[in-house]
Each structure stands twice: as structure tokens, then as C-alpha cells.
Amino acid sequence: MAGWIQAQQLQGDALRQMQVLYGQHFPIEVRHYLAQWIESQPWDAIDLDNPQDRAQATQLLEGLVQELQKKAEHQVGEDGFLLKIKLGHYATQLQKTYDRCPLELVRCIRHILYNEQRLVREANNCSSPAGILVDAMSQKHLQINQTFEELRLVTQDTENELKKLQQTQEYFIIQYQESLRIQAQFAQLAQLSPQERLSRETALQQKQVSLEAWLQREAQTLQQYRVELAEKHQKTLQLLRKQQTIILDDELIQWKRRQQLAGNGGPPEGSLDVLQSWCEKLAEIIWQNRQQIRRAEHLCQQLPIPGPVEEMLAEVNATITDIISALVTSTFIIEKQPPQVLKTQTKFAATVRLLVGGKLNVHMNPPQVKATIISEQQAKSLLKNENTRNECSGEILNNCCVMEYHQATGTLSAHFRNMSLKRIKRADRRGAESVTEEKFTVLFESQFSVGSNELVFQVKTLSLPVVVIVHGSQDHNATATVLWDNAFAEPGRVPFAVPDKVLWPQLCEALNMKFKAEVQSNRGLTKENLVFLAQKLFNNSSSHLEDYSGLSVSWSQFNRENLPGWNYTFWQWFDGVMEVLKKHHKPHWNDGAILGFVNKQQAHDLLINKPDGTFLLRFSDSEIGGITIAWKFDSPERNLWNLKPFTTRDFSIRSLADRLGDLSYLIYVFPDRPKDEVFSKYYTPVLAKAVDGYVKPQIKQVVPEFVNASADAGGSSATYMDQAPSPAVCPQAPYNMYPQNPDHVLDQDGEFDLDETMDVARHVEELLRRPMDSLDSRLSPPAGLFTSARGSLS
């Protein structure tokens, strides 16, 4: 009842609009006295196009009538007497009106409730941005549904007019035949006597004059009916075009844009069910009007009357055929896109769908769809209607599929499950363009027969641009091409033109979307992260994001030219960050344990005033996909330390958490979180003791300079010494202590050279898998790789 209470508070034009909703089809008194009952019924749960829901609609009609009768019976007194009669009359009237078509009652009440809600929302003027967005969307959908209701009513009106025209014309033909019969009777008068002939002739002449006058008037009436019907069809087609433009050029294009952004990690494009229901309603109404126009043409051919109608009907017939053609060709879409980075000799899938397949009898003769790969230039020629028949740029295996109709969902679609690109033919490259910048597209084409083969349409649709690679090493640069295209493609572009430059804030949005999707995290790029990226890209030291908002980024800056002073592009560095996080550090990033986007100087500034043992994790500048540890520890030599970066290869040997656990002098995660509180849940569990008599070795992260410090300390309890066993390491029998050689461990820049020792470590790890008594003394590992039982293998 809350809805009706709000509706009663409407004023001015809104109140007048609400009053127009009611009439003999549904009196406003019924809405008022049964407000609570009406608002509690499941009107939206009924599918108006499903005959099986008729029974539920009948129950609602019966319930409405019973509620009215009950309300009438409870009226007492003088005023109640009149209301009792009125409500009883309404109950009878509604029963008679909707008894044969209960679904129309549901349609009527839904229309009323939708418009009431719209008027109330407009009056309230929602103030929140989210509310405005949702309201705007619901408003648009409501407007579409209202237009469909209007189209249904005008189509029903022209159907009634057509029937009236047909009945009038049939009666006219009967009377015309009567006129011919009278003329035949005149010819027979010669056989009668003069007196009888004169008497009969006078009567026949009077009858003929009267009939011819009537025929002349009726001919004009018929012509007027025909013109009025053609004019109504013209108006209907104008409304149909407008509705179709909203659905195909606005709603469907927006869905395709969402699908494109989903390729960059944006939110899913959403279901096609609502769009399909709209397209199917369009198809039904268009087809009904086309059939009406054809019947009108048949009536004109049956009884030709000179006038403008033939030309008008020919025009509306051509118009409605164009409308059907646009609907069928535009609703042949790719529901599931092929991969946009497409590797040769690799299986891939795609799904195409016809959104009107269940309404125009297309599914009665299931069409076959063919997929071919074409170049960007071939796609341009195709859209210009140039002759490109049978031209392609490669060979796709398993590229033909028959569309299937799914009765339960009402969808007509073709699922390509096992396609494979056997070969690709590349075009001549332009300038500095690499093979990973060359764009192709998968062309899907078919032929649809509509309405029992009355109309046949050749349909084609292009996939989003794809970049073809032959080796996994090309994947990263190909992804950059796809990212740029998906993010910055403009509506209605020539294939596959994109801006060469975009504003930095636009690129930030695309990077953040891709980052969250790849890392599968809600923790996106912060303002500080974006400042760091801007500093890196523009080689600028400003720490204010606003300073970069007006700067443009070219494609060359993004992934063609190396960053100043480095041997990689901006995208290659950023992609390496995403890859290492995705493969190894998603939980640590989500926990906020990885600061990441800070350079060495910024790390120094953050740590300099922190207690010894405070550390942070940042992405390496020198190594793509590298993560380095920076920590504070005062010593005579220095007070800030940086380890040589770890990469994906290193983390596949020993996890980040275990490496941090090995280094006991790392105590606090910046700014002040205890290390074990953050990382202990990710430590590898301690292995059970061996049962075969052998002690199992463990790999342990060691920083040799700190091990030296530990040995020099002679057992002191300083927290920076690497004295405690790793959380993942069991105490083991002591080994001989080898002297450490730190000469190449910390470089001049204060970073540990992991690459120089990792191969040796792997070799020793392999040796340690053998029984200890079988190792020849000649296989002793190099100096500096073993520590005591408190240490471990580096």
C-alpha cells in the first residue's frame, strides 16, 4: 500500500499523468480500495508471452473480483450504499472485460504500477549518484517497456482497422455484384411486354441509381480507410524504428562495450536474456505489422481503386523489410568471444547467438555458421561491402557449426568447441610495428531464412580483434595490444582503429581494471601506486597525481620504446609485476604485506626512522617481475639493506613467506606489523622426522654477510643474527662450518646477487637428496653454502 500512499501525494503534471493511467479498463476506485491487495500480488512473475501462465493470470482476476465483491458487501450507510453498487458494478465489468484474456489484466496492472513508480521516483528526485544511476537504468527500461505497450496497442488498433476494412470491402463486393446483377436484368427486359417492361425498368432504374450512389460513396469510404490504415502503419513504423534504435544502437552496443571491457578484466557483460526478450518482442510486432501490410496490399489487388494507397503500401512494405533486415543482422552476435591472444595449433572456443531465432521460425531450418580468420584490412573491405569473398588470412580447423535451438531457454546458438588455428598469413608490417601489434578478427557468417523462407538474409559478425602468436614468449606484448584496443576503441570505428595517444587518467583506469582482474584482488592501485607508475613512465619526480592528469601517453611510450635507462618497456615491467603477484603472492598482496610500488630511495625514506629489523617488500626496478626486500639494520657499514630481487623462478623453489621466515633479523613488516603475525600462516609446515635413518636436508635463505656477523658474535643474542631455525626447518645434526665468502653477495648498490648462487644451490639440493654416506668427499659443496644446524642450505 506504500506505493499508493506515495502516488496520492503527487501534484501538478505528475498527478495528471497518473490519473490518465486509469479509466474503464481499470477504474481508479479499484486501485484505491484494493491498494494493499494489488501491491502484494506477483504481477511481475507472470510471463505475458507464455500461454502456460494464463492459469495464474485467471487466478489473479478471480481474486481481484472476489476482493471487490467483499469490499462492496462491507459498505453500510447512505454513502456506503452508493459505493456498494459502484464496486459491485466494477467487479462485474472487470470480469466481463478480462474473462477471455486474463493476461491483459496483468499487462494493464503492471503498466499502471510501473508508471506510478516512475512518477513517484521523478517527484522524489533521487540524490545519491548510485541511486541516480540505478534509477536512470530502470527509467530507461521502463520507457522501453512502455513503448512496447504502446506498440502493442497501435498494432492491435491497425489489426482492428484492417478487419473493418476487410468487412467493408467484402460487403462492397457483394453490393457490386448486386449492381452487376441489376445490369443483367436490364438486358432481360426486352423479353417482357411493354407495360411490364416499363414497370420493371422504372423499379430497376431506381434501385440501380440508389445502389450506384451507395457504391460511389462506399468506394470513397474504402479509399479513405485504406489511406488511414497506411498512415497508421507509417506512424507505427516510425515508433518501431525509434524503439529498435534504442535497443540495437544503445542497449546492444552497450552490452558489446561491456563485453569488450570484460576482456580487460572489467565486470562481466551480463546476461543477454533481457536484450533477447526485447528483440523477440520487436520481431513479433514487426512481423505482425508486415503481415497486416501484406493483407492490405492483397485487399487493394482484390479491389483496385485509383489513388495514392498503392504507392503508400509499397513504401511501408519496403520500410518494414529494412527494419526486419536490420533486426536480424544486428542480433546475430558473439556471445562468447574467441581468445584475443590466439596461439596457433591451440584449441579455442567461441559461441554465436541469434537473439530473434525463436520468433521468426529461423530455428525450423537450423542454419550453419562458418568461422574464418581475416586481417584488419580485409575487415575494413568487408564493412565497405567490397568484394572479399573467400578471402582469409589463415586456416581454422573445425570451423563449421550448426545452430541449435534450446527449447527451455529459447536460445538459438552455435557452440564452436574445438577450433584450432592451423596457420596464419601475416601482412607486410609498417615501420616499427611488430607481429604482436598486428590485429586479426574471426568472421562468423551464415544465412537465415525468415518466416517460412519468405525472406533470406546473409549475416556476418566480427569478433573483437585478436593477436596471433606462435610462441608463449609473445604473449605479454600481444596482451598489451589487446589491452590498448579494448580500453580505447571508440564506437563505430573503422576496424581496428584506436587512438595513438590517450590521457594518463584513461590509462590509469585501464591498468587498474587489468591489475585487479589478473591478481584477482579487490585491492587495486592506490593514488600512491599511480603516482609511482607516472614517475616511472614520464621520468618525472613529482609526487602529485594531479600534475600528470593532463599528460598524454602514446602507444610507443606504453609498449614500444624502452623506459629511459632500462632495457624494458613500461608495459613489460607492469605485466611482470602482475605475473609474479598472480602466480605467487596474491594472499600477501591482499593482506597488504607487499608495499610494492616504491623505488629504492622511497624505501630508504620510509625505513630510515624505523626500528632495526623493519622491512618492506617492493617491486624491483632492475628485474622484470622481481621482488626485493629492503630492511633497516644499523651496522658500521650501512643502515639500509637491499636484497637482490627474487623472481618467479626463485619463488617456485622456495616461497616468499619461507624465505622471510628464514631471516630472523627481519622482525617487522613496514610500518610496524610483527612478521610472524603476517606471514606465519603461509610458512611450509615442518616435515616429519625421517624413518629410514637419514636426516632430511632443508633449503634455507641465507644472507652471507649476516651469517658472518653471526659467527663473529660468538653466540650473542642480537636479533639480526641468523641463529634461529627457519619455521619450516627441523633442527638437524651439525655440519662442518665453512667460512663465508661475501665478496659477491652484496654489490656496490647493496643488493644480494641471487642469480650467481642459485644454480649452485640447485645442484647442491640435488646432491643432498642422496644418502649422506654415499657422497664422495670430492662432491663437497662450494664454500659459503652450508651453515651450522642453526643455518641451512642457501
UniProtKB/Swiss-Prot annotation:
The modification Phosphoserine is found at residues 128, 193, 780. It comes from the Eukaryota. Residues 589-686 form the SH2 domain. One of its GO terms (molecular function) is DNA-binding transcription factor activity, RNA polymerase II-specific. GO terms for cellular component: chromatin; cytoplasm; cytosol; nucleoplasm; nucleus; RNA polymerase II transcription regulator complex. Keywords: Activator, Cytoplasm, DNA-binding, Lactation, Nucleus, Phosphoprotein, SH2 domain, Transcription, Transcription regulation, Ubl conjugation. Residues 773-794 are annotated as: Disordered. It is found in: Cytoplasm; Nucleus. GO terms for biological process: activated T cell proliferation; B cell differentiation; cell surface receptor signaling pathway via JAK-STAT; cellular response to granulocyte macrophage colony-stimulating factor stimulus; cytokine-mediated signaling pathway; defense response; development of secondary female sexual characteristics; development of secondary male sexual characteristics. InterPro entries: p53-like_TF_DNA-bd_sf, SH2, SH2_dom_sf, STAT, STAT5_CCD, STAT5a/5b_DBD, STAT_linker, STAT_N_sf. CDD domains: SH2_STAT5a, STAT5_CCD, STAT5_DBD. Pfam families: SH2, STAT_alpha, STAT_bind, STAT_int, STAT_linker. Tyrosine phosphorylated in response to KITLG/SCF, IL2, IL3, IL7, IL15, CSF2/GMCSF, GH1, PRL, EPO and THPO. Activated KIT promotes phosphorylation on tyrosine residues and subsequent translocation to the nucleus. Tyrosine phosphorylated in response to constitutively activated FGFR1, FGFR2, FGFR3 and FGFR4. Tyrosine phosphorylation is required for DNA-binding activity and dimerization. Serine phosphorylation is also required for maximal transcriptional activity. ISGylated. The modification Phosphotyrosine is found at residues 90, 682, 694. PANTHER family: SIGNAL TRANSDUCER AND ACTIVATOR OF TRANSCRIPTION (PTHR11801). Carries out a dual function: signal transduction and activation of transcription. Mediates cellular responses to the cytokine KITLG/SCF and other growth factors. Mediates cellular responses to ERBB4. May mediate cellular responses to activated FGFR1, FGFR2, FGFR3 and FGFR4. Binds to the GAS element and activates PRL-induced transcription. Regulates the expression of milk proteins during lactation. Forms a homodimer or a heterodimer with a related family member. Binds NR3C1. Interacts with NCOA1 and SOCS7. Interacts with ERBB4. Interacts with EBF4. Interacts with CD69. Belongs to the transcription factor STAT family. This is Signal transducer and activator of transcription 5A. It comes from Homo sapiens (Human).
